[in-house]
Amino acid sequence: MFSTETIERLLKVIPHNELYSSPIKGLFLRHSDQPFCYEGIIQEPSICIVLSGEREVQLGEQCYRFDNQHFMFCPVNIPMRGEIKYAEPQKPFLVMSMKIDIESVSKILLANPNLADDVQKGDEGFAQWHLDESLKNAVERLLLLHENPKDIEFLASLIQQEIYYRLLTGEQGGKFKAMVSNGSHTKKIAQATHYLQQHFNETITVETLANLSGMSLSGFHSHFKKITSLSPLQYQKSLRLMEARRLIAQEGRGITEAAYQVGYESPSQFSREYKRYFGHAPKGDTK
């Protein structure tokens, strides 16, 4: 658990009620003193740690709750929704997200061959992990660099290396290593998710994705669901609906036009699935 003192020190040096892109590479912080929802984001490979408050994440039909003792590990790009139900000025919500630098993790494994054991062990992908004291301390030191920005250039990368080391040597090490290990299920599924993001508005069969990943059809489907918490169809549908919402809400496109542009053949089916996913009809997002 992060101390009240640490939270107060951070709140003095980061912007309030917005997503803050830190000068520390790959690090983002989000503060809020009121509840809010995020209805469609692509979470890149990262760890996300709630410093204060609680966060709910929705993946398909599953809901995960994260607090300051349990953090989120996202090994591949995953579309997700979420909600912060409780936040107020006296008890604000504060979360950090740190993108995982695959190259840095690979270098640590190359320099320490003994860490490369049991790469496949517990290869389950998206996960909720306990935040142990050694990892918490490293994260705390990284965040408090914001008090002395001149230290960031030299110290931030060193502390991030320590964070990767703690993840590699912790109880979750096998799953974390699978991200960067050639031949691991996580690495293969990452290829499929990348392809889906590039071709989400096309008709794609699961057989095509399985062949692309070099896996059997049944094996691919099983591991895709384990690693992303979504089926391939749910994953593609999430990408389509999120892009459609952006087209409607931000670009002012018509509902039917957006439906066809993201790959739907039936506007009525699109409207039904949009309402089921976001909780309201597409017209609720029109300008």
Predicted regions mapped to residue ranges:
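N-terminal regulatory/effector-sensing and dimerization cores
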Residues: 19-117
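Amphipathic, well-ordered alpha-helical segments in soluble domains
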Residues: 46-49, 104, 134, 138, ...
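Terminal helix-turn-helix DNA-binding modules in bacterial transcription factors
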Residues: 193-198, 202-215, 225-268, 280, ...
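Short hydrophobic/aromatic patch on the recognition helix
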Residues: 69, 220-224, 269-270, 274
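A short, N-terminal "cap"/entry segment at the start of jelly-roll beta-barrel domains
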Residues: 1-23, 36, 119-123, 145
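Short, Lys/Arg-enriched, Trp-marked, Pro/Gly-tolerant hinge/linker segments that flank
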Residues: 117-133, 145-202, 207-213, 226-234, ...
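Residues that scaffold the ATP/ADP-binding catalytic core of kinase and kinase-like folds
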Residues: 82, 108, 166, 235, ...
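A generic hydrophobic-segment detector
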Residues: 113-143, 259-263, 270, 277, ...
